[in-house]
C-alpha cells in the first residue's frame, strides 16, 4: 500500500473568524498562518495549498508588546536614491491597521507562488463587521491576550 498524498482538490476548506481585540500581533500572526497553511490538518503537505480561509476582525484594536508602537519601524523604499521611508508602527497602525496585520501574517508564509496563493485566503477588516457571513465562519479563539 502506497502513501496517500493529497492533491489540491482533495481538501475541504473551512472559514474561521478571529477577533483581534487585545491580542498580541505576533501571537495572532502565528495562529492565522497555521490555519492558512493547513498545518492543523493531518493531511498537511508542504507543496499543496490545503489551508482554510481566515477572517480577522477588529484589526485596529490589536496589541503590541513593549515599546513597539514607538520603537519598531516599517521601512519602504521608492526605488530612487534617498527614497527610504521610515514610519513607526504606531503611526502605521493608526492609518492602516489592516496593512500591519497583513504584513505580519504574510511574513510567516512561504515567499513563493504557493505563498501568494495562500495570501489570497486572508481577509482582514479594521472594524467588527465583515461581508462573509454567507460562508458561516467558525469563531477561532486565541487563548493568550495582552496583559
Swiss-Prot record:
PANTHER family linked: LARGE RIBOSOMAL SUBUNIT PROTEIN UL13M, RIBOSOMAL PROTEIN L13
Family stated for the protein in its record: Belongs to the universal ribosomal protein uL13 family.
Subunit and interaction comment: Part of the 50S ribosomal subunit.
Keywords: Ribonucleoprotein, Ribosomal protein
Gene name of the encoded protein: rplM
InterPro entries in the cross-refs: Ribosomal_uL13, Ribosomal_uL13_bac-type, Ribosomal_uL13_sf
GO CC terms of this entry: cytosolic large ribosomal subunit
GO biological process, one term: negative regulation of translation
Function, in words: This protein is one of the early assembly proteins of the 50S ribosomal subunit, although it is not seen to bind rRNA by itself. It is important during the early stages of 50S assembly.
Gene Ontology MF, one: mRNA binding
Gene3D superfamilies: Ribosomal protein L13 (3.90.1180.10)
UniProt cross-references to HAMAP family, sorted A to Z: Ribosomal_uL13 (MF_01366)
The keyword Ribonucleoprotein is annotated on this UniProt entry: yes
Stated name of the protein: Large ribosomal subunit protein uL13
Amino acid at each position: 500500500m502506497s502513501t496517500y498524498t493529497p492533491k489540491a482538490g482533495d481538501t475541504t476548506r473551512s472559514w474561521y473568524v478571529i477577533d483581534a481585540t487585545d491580542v498580541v500581533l505576533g501571537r495572532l500572526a502565528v495562529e492565522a498562518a497555521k490555519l492558512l497553511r493547513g498545518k492543523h490538518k493531518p493531511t498537511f503537505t508542504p507543496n499543496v495549498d490545503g489551508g482554510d480561509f481566515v477572517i480577522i476582525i477588529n484589526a485596529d484594536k490589536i496589541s503590541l508588546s513593549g515599546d513597539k508602537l514607538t520603537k519598531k519601524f516599517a521601512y519602504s523604499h521608492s526605488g530612487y536614491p534617498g527614497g527610504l521611508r521610515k514610519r513607526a508602527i504606531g503611526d502605521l497602525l493608526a492609518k492602516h491597521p489592516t496593512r500591519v496585520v497583513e504584513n505580519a501574517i504574510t511574513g510567516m508564509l512561504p515567499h513563493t507562488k504557493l505563498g501568494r496563493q495562500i495570501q489570497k485566503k486572508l481577509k482582514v477588516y479594521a472594524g467588527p463587521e465583515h461581508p462573509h457571513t454567507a460562508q458561516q465562519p467558525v469563531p477561532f479563539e486565541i487563548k493568550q491576550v495582552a496583559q
